[in-house]
């Protein structure tokens, strides 16, 4: 973490400067003590075998008397009780008001709505400083993608400074894996590194991964490539110091080829965890689920995503969880068949990011990994996804909704242009924001237009339904009547570039 210094969208220089103030404000001669910490790490390493950390754990955790135990128990129907209590409270308050006081509240509400709909004056808006478009760099930084080969497998080398960290991704093309196995492939990505292997319990494996690497994970990703075209990938990735690359690949082999996919008790535990997490995801980030579900009616890309992480996957996991004993054999067979079809040499591409060492430094490790892959089989046709227009609604226990609608403008004969990125900014921070958020509607509202044509509107934590759809319906009228002066258009364009032109970390290459 220290060497990576990954601050997300914020520039490193800015974040280092803020860190310096933690000491610099109090000692003019020590601006760098919170940045130069290699010496501290060296001292901590020397204490590993001296009982230092065990002493800290015993003193501040095990023998610490300052603790509390909190038990949270669910109560069926609690939300209905709270809703009724609130309704009774509001009714009692209204009954306590005189007729004049009620009229006053109604009038104040009307005034509030009027103020929400009232636009700021031009003079007020021009008090806000705006940079010039000429201040924005127009050239795009070129990406470093040097193609080579190791062990007969294509390697993409991204030459960026990584502070002696190697970032390795082993990507496997899943285009030939049939749709009935896709949920099992998604589940496979979830369980790798958290099930027992031939040589480790899953707890020991987790410790070994943490000691020797910056993490090992498996993910499924799907990338749109053209209108109604996509590329599904199964990715094993790790990051480690150059000096630990041999151990990192040993662990990658252990995870990919030695994982026990038939441990019944452990599989049931993991399925329960995934089921719970998916339920939480559907309620806390339901706007993403709603938007992708709506796009899945016409987009093969979105329909595939549904099968691996959306409502469709939730329904699959729910069945596994509720009928586990009956489904167990199917789950194990599905996992093993998915792994066999994925882990073939002909599917594999390696992505490596690092500058101090060329890819050849891990040649022996890559070749050893390739030896463990399944023998290449004749592949079937590229997977096809069937889209079904359903127009659905899903009930949850929450008191708010996530309202989405979607379509594809390329299917209507229109082409993508960069102006749609600016329109997305205008919609999100002007039209949708004012018509929905400011006027007491959803807590959030957003839209997107992809270069494949997929488009959507969606709200976040929305108390309304029909009202939000009416706003969506009038979006075209808003664009037809849209007018803005040079200053406003400059703000929209600058805001659009600001959302795109962010630091990209080596780990993201």
PLM regions and their residue ranges:
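Short alpha-helical segments and helix-capping/turn motifs at coil-helix boundaries
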Residues: 39, 50-59, 152-155, 172-174, ...
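M16 family metallopeptidases and their MPP-like homologs
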Residues: 1-45, 65-75, 163-193, 197-325, ...
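Long, compositionally biased intrinsically disordered regions
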Residues: 35, 42, 55-142, 279, ...
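His/Glu-based metal-binding/catalytic segments typifying zinc-dependent metallopeptidases
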Residues: 10-30, 34, 96-189, 193, ...
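A diffuse structural propensity rather than consistent per-protein peaks
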Residues: 49, 129-132, 201, 263, ...
């Amino acid at each position: 973490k220290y060497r990576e210094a990954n601050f997300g969208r914020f520039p490193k220089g800015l974040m280092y400067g803020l860190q310096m103030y933690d000491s610099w404000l109090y000692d003019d001669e020590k601006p760098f003590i919170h940045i130069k910490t290699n010496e501290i790490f060296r001292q901590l390493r020397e204490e590993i075998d001296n009982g230092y950390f065990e002493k800290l754990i015993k003193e501040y955790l095990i023998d610490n008397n300052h603790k509390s135990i909190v038990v949270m128990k669910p109560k069926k129907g609690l939300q209905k009780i709270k809703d009724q209590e609130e309704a009774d409270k509001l009714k009692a308050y209204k009954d306590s008001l005189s007729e004049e006081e009620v009229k006053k509240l109604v009038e104040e509400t009307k005034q509030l709505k009027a103020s929400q709909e009232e636009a700021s004056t031009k003079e007020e808006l021009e008090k806000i400083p705006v940079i010039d478009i000429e201040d924005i760099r127009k050239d795009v930084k070129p990406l470093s993608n040097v193609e080579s080969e190791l062990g007969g497998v294509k390697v993409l080398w991204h030459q960026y400074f990584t502070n002696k960290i190697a970032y390795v991704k082993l990507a496997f093309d899943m285009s030939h894996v049939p749709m009935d196995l896709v949920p099992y492939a998604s589940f496979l990505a979830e369980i790798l590194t958290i099930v027992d292997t031939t040589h480790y319990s899953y707890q020991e494996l987790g410790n070994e991964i943490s000691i020797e690497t910056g993490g090992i994970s498996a993910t499924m990703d799907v990338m749109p490539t053209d209108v109604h075209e996509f590329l599904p990938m199964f990715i094993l990735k790790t990051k480690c110091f150059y000096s630990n690359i041999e151990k990192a690949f040993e662990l990658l082999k252990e995870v990919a080829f030695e994982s026990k996919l038939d441990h019944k008790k452990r599989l049931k535990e993991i399925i329960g965890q995934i089921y719970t997490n998916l339920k939480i995801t559907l309620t806390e980030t339901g706007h993403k689920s709603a938007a992708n579900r709506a796009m899945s009616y016409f987009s093969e890309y979105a329909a595939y995503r549904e099968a691996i992480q959306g409502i469709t996957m939730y329904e699959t996991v729910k069945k596994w969880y509720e009928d586990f004993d009956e489904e167990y054999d199917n789950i194990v067979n599905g996992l093993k068949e998915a792994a066999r079809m994925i882990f073939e040499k002909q599917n594999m591409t390696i992505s490596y990011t690092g500058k101090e060492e060329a890819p050849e430094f891990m040649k022996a490790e890559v070749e050893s990994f390739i030896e463990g892959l399944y023998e290449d089989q004749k592949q079937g046709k590229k997977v096809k996804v069937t889209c079904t227009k359903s127009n659905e609604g899903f009930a949850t226990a929450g008191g708010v909704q996530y309202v989405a609608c979607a379509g594809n403008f390329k299917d209507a004969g229109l082409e993508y242009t960069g102006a749609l990125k600016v329109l997305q900014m205008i919609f999100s921070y002007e039209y949708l924001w004012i018509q929905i958020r400011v006027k007491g509607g959803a807590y959030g509202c957003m839209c997107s237009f992809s270069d494949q044509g997929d488009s959507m509107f969606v709200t976040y934590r929305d108390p309304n339904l029909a009202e939000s759809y009416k706003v969506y319906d009038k979006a075209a009228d808003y664009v037809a009547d849209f007018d803005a002066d040079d200053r406003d258009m400059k703000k929209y364009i600058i805001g659009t570039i600001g959302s795109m032109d962010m630091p990209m970390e080596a780990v993201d290459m």
